[in-house]
């Protein structure tokens, strides 16, 4: 993912499940500013969201539900229960994805 993102700096990339190993995944993408960490899929381990925000900034963390793999409650609890500011939770739970999709939505007439 990192190599692909470096070859295409104009693009934005979402690292689903943060690469499968969240601690390693967050650290690997840390210096690649056009890669975002999606925090679905893993067990609701304490500290996951806090680490992602600390290492990447809330602007590069995106919520994912992992529907079918985990319960909705366990996945959303990783963000809602995290020890981060409410403003960071708002970005993670929708603001960041909305910002990333805005150009595409606007081009298709779904946003102004």
Across the structure, where does each feature detected by a protein language model lie?
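Catalytic pocket-lining loop regions of alpha/beta-barrel enzymes
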Residues: 1-62, 109-112
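Conserved, mostly hydrophobic/aromatic
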Residues: 17, 37, 52, 66, ...
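Short, surface-exposed, polar/charged, turn-prone segments marking secondary-structure boundaries
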Residues: 41-45, 63-68, 89-93
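Mid-to-C-terminal alpha-helical segments outside catalytic/metal-binding sites
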Residues: 58-60, 71-112
């Amino acid at each position: 993912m990192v190599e692909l993102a470096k070859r295409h700096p104009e693009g934005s990339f979402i690292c689903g499940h943060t690469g499968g190993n969240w601690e390693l995944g967050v650290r690997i993408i840390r210096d690649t500013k056009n890669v975002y960490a999606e925090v679905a899929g893993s067990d609701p381990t304490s500290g996951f969201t806090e680490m992602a925000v600390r290492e990447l900034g809330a602007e590069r963390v995106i919520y994912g539900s992992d529907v079918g793999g985990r319960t909705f409650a366990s996945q959303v609890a990783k963000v809602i229960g995290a020890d981060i500011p409410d403003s960071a939770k708002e970005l993670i739970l929708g603001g960041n994805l909305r910002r990333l999709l805005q150009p595409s939505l606007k081009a298709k007439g779904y946003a102004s």
